[in-house]
Curated annotation (Swiss-Prot):
<keyword id="KW-0496">Mitochondrion</keyword>
<keyword id="KW-0227">DNA damage</keyword>
<keyword id="KW-0539">Nucleus</keyword>
<dbReference type="InterPro" id="IPR019734">
    <property type="entry name" value="TPR_rpt"/>
</dbReference>
<feature type="repeat" description="TPR 5">
    <location>
        <begin position="179"/>
        <end position="216"/>
    </location>
</feature>
<keyword id="KW-0802">TPR repeat</keyword>
<comment type="subunit">
    <text>Interacts with JMY and p300/EP300; the interaction occurs in the nucleus and augments the association between JMY and p300/EP300 in response to DNA damage. Interacts with PRMT5; the interaction is DNA damage-dependent and promotes PRMT5 interaction with p53/TP53 and subsequent methylation. Forms a complex with HSF1 and p300/EP300; these interactions augment chromatin-bound HSF1 and p300/EP300 histone acetyltransferase activity, resulting in enhanced heat-shock-responsive transcription.</text>
</comment>
<dbReference type="Pfam" id="PF16669">
    <property type="entry name" value="TTC5_OB"/>
</dbReference>
<dbReference type="InterPro" id="IPR032076">
    <property type="entry name" value="TTC5_OB"/>
</dbReference>
<dbReference type="GO" id="GO:0005634">
    <property type="term" value="C:nucleus"/>
</dbReference>
<protein>
    <recommendedName>
        <fullName>Tetratricopeptide repeat protein 5</fullName>
    </recommendedName>
</protein>
<feature type="repeat" description="TPR 4">
    <location>
        <begin position="136"/>
        <end position="174"/>
    </location>
</feature>
<keyword id="KW-0597">Phosphoprotein</keyword>
<dbReference type="InterPro" id="IPR038645">
    <property type="entry name" value="TTC5_OB_sf"/>
</dbReference>
<keyword id="KW-0677">Repeat</keyword>
<feature type="repeat" description="TPR 1">
    <location>
        <begin position="7"/>
        <end position="61"/>
    </location>
</feature>
<dbReference type="GO" id="GO:0045944">
    <property type="term" value="P:positive regulation of transcription by RNA polymerase II"/>
</dbReference>
Amino acid sequence: MMADEEEEAKHVLQKLQGLVDRLYCFRDSYFETHSVEDAGRKQQDVQEEMEKTLQQMEEVLGSAQVEAQALMLKGKALNVTPDYSPEAEVLLSKAVKLEPELVEAWNQLGEVYWKKGDVASAHTCFSGALTHCKNKVSLQNLSMVLRQLQTDSGDEHSRHVMDSVRQAKLAVQMDVLDGRSWYILGNAYLSLYFNTGQNPKISQQALSAYAQAEKVDRKASSNPDLHLNRATLHKYEESYGEALEGFSQAAALDPVWPEPQQREQQLLEFLSRLTSLLESKGKTKPKKLQSMLGSLRPAHLGPCGDGRYQSASGQKMTLELKPLSTLQPGVNSGTVVLGKVVFSLTTEEKVPFTFGLVDSDGPCYAVMVYNVVQSWGVLIGDSVAIPEPNLRHHQIRHKGKDYSFSSVRVETPLLLVVNGKPQNSSSQASATVASRPQCE
């Protein structure tokens, strides 16, 4: 190529790069120039901006000699929407064949495969890009892909999730001011939380990463997936006010995505049904309730009543039977409560298994049991003992509605004694988390 031609090609590429950068800036900073009310138009506006950009790129290219970089930029422009583009796949595949060291083309091609649902090929692209050059985009994308790879065993999936956290941390280390890296680290911790028995320390790390994403990058606050994923964690931790707020914000930012609205509605219905059942004690008639409570026996405490109870630290201890009304917020160590089930409530998500417990004429308490298999449950009239109950008082206000109740959180059915009997290990399952894979 002659010097003049080289200069011309360089000038063309600079112009193309500028057009593509402007297109991505339009998409990523959309809510800095538009209000949340315009959220429903965003996809259409981005599509129109993409078409305009492609037209301008054609004019700039003219009869200039096409090379890998130009193919990559055109493929990247086509890849700006959330949808899979076959044309982008063709252009980017050509670009990496012409210039295998072109890391950005590998990253873009990986994203195309990701949108196509071909997770294995996406993984190959991002891993391949990292062999050419360590870069934060490949690390971010690899972190996402690892959590979606098909595996033959739970152990293999756990290894992928741990690796996903590692890659996200590396991305953060490369640029601590990149909000996307922090957001992806939050998602990796979210998966780890559900994959390793819901350790509160890990949920705190997820929430901190999401907060950091918003702190370093204003655009992160406009990401509906961040709000939905954080709300999922809040819901599981029974911070219902924050969960409702998150679902509502995600729905406002992406009105055409039905999931946030559905999740907000489901949670509101759950809280409404729960508070109604708690107030009416499961609609149990006073005479029936007296008869149920009269049949409670010390034998119903099982191992919680004979000094055989083993605490989390492994030591055997005697628990003191106390009324529900005397419980303090938090874990009530050295205490056991015993009551009768007056209702149970299942949700579409099946988690938690919720039931109402009474032990006197006092109020009815919600008991929320996590990590249960679908076949497990308790029946109305069952006697249930809960050792070292973890109490929480809820005061929730959302969109003009108030919900107020007290609940006891039980991490596994194995902690409960039902009708004097400890629960079988087959009653326990582990929780999973679902996310919108192509939209991290």
